[in-house]
Amino acid sequence: MALKQLAAAVALALSIQAAQGAAVKEKRATCSNGATVGDASSCAWFDVLDDIQQNLFNGAQCGAEAHESIRLVFHDAIAISPALESQGKFGGGGADGSIILFDDIETNFHPNIGLDEIVNLQKPFIQKHGVTPGDFIAFAGAVAMSNCPGAPQMNFFTGRAPATQAAPDGLVPEPFHTVDQIISRVNDAGEFDELELVWMLSAHSVAAANDVDPTIQGLAFDSTPGVFDSQFFVETQLRGTAFPGSGGNQGEVESPLPGEMRLQSDSSIARDSRTACEWQSFVNNQSKLVSDFQFIFLALTQLGENPDAMTDCSDVIPISKPVPNNVPFSFFPAGKTMADVEQACAETPFPTLTTLPGPETSVQRIQPPPGA
């Protein structure tokens, strides 16, 4: 989805909003809990919200279950290929919930290894509340992200029909893929460009690896995995010095901090001339991080769908807490300085950041979901 398409889409959305403002206001409904929503059908999702916040996300925490729910959104949605369709083959349904409906097939695909745990955790909620898997994946991902301080106001639309067949294998990027391969894949999936690829990877701000290193799970990608901030974009540009576990694993390269995982793909995209400046642009720029991820998350959750036929239930999604104010938006972890930065953007210098005081930062493991 090129930036000119984004600009056109925003302009169209604003014109529609202006033209239909009065009608939307009249359509708003009040739910039994007193909340006001844009469409009465959204009210049913408050029961789902209360249930998953307590029983899936452990009291609205930005923990392992939230991280894996966000990951599941991408792995379900990106499995769509117009290129395959043009060859007369089934190209996948995008954000249709096929990874849950056909989990015996899709969770065995190599890039989806480990997702069977969150799929099994989500299934009972889908059955209990009678919603479609595609809608639930998008909802759980939006709620999960809202549990992470600093996250944007997440959007959520309903209307996804159940998937009719499993997505083909080979459509989810792997951490050992080249930058060319990954850019090509996301461009095929949704006409996303290299800048929008970087926006997608903002999700790694609140993420961890459970299966890249088979000897250790819950390895975070940055030192603040419970906060949606730009530390991921800072720390991926620091010189790698060691592996957090066994090392030598496919798709892993050295990281700068003890206990931190660095994916080969993240390292490569952070240093590629096509993406390095966009990567660096998020450092110390929380507002850009928030707005770009808000857009790309919605775009991902509508892959394979007709947005005009969907219902906006974003009113149900909680508003995230702000980033804690006891530390800067971006900083060098204790023990790191500008000398550790591997400058990749040729257009602008790396921002000047404060180094946190104290002994060298060591990143704590995130407890994986039950059964992992």
Curated annotation (Swiss-Prot):
Gene name of this polypeptide: GLG6
Keywords assigned: Calcium, Cleavage on pair of basic residues, Disulfide bond, Glycoprotein, Heme, Hydrogen peroxide, Iron, Lignin degradation, Metal-binding, Oxidoreductase, Peroxidase, Signal, Zymogen
Positions of Ca(2+) 2 binding: S205, D222, T224, V227, D229
Signal peptide: 1-21
Listed pathway(s): Secondary metabolite metabolism; lignin degradation
Compositional bias per record (Low complexity), positions renumbered to this chain: 352-361
The protein's name in its UniProt record: Ligninase LG6
Lineage: Eukaryota, Fungi, Dikarya, Basidiomycota, Agaricomycotina
Gene3D superfamilies given in the database record: 1.10.520.10, Peroxidase, domain 2
Gene source species: Phanerodontia chrysosporium
Binding-site positions, heme b: H204
GO molecular function, one term: diarylpropane peroxidase activity
Matches recorded under Pfam families: peroxidase, Peroxidase_ext
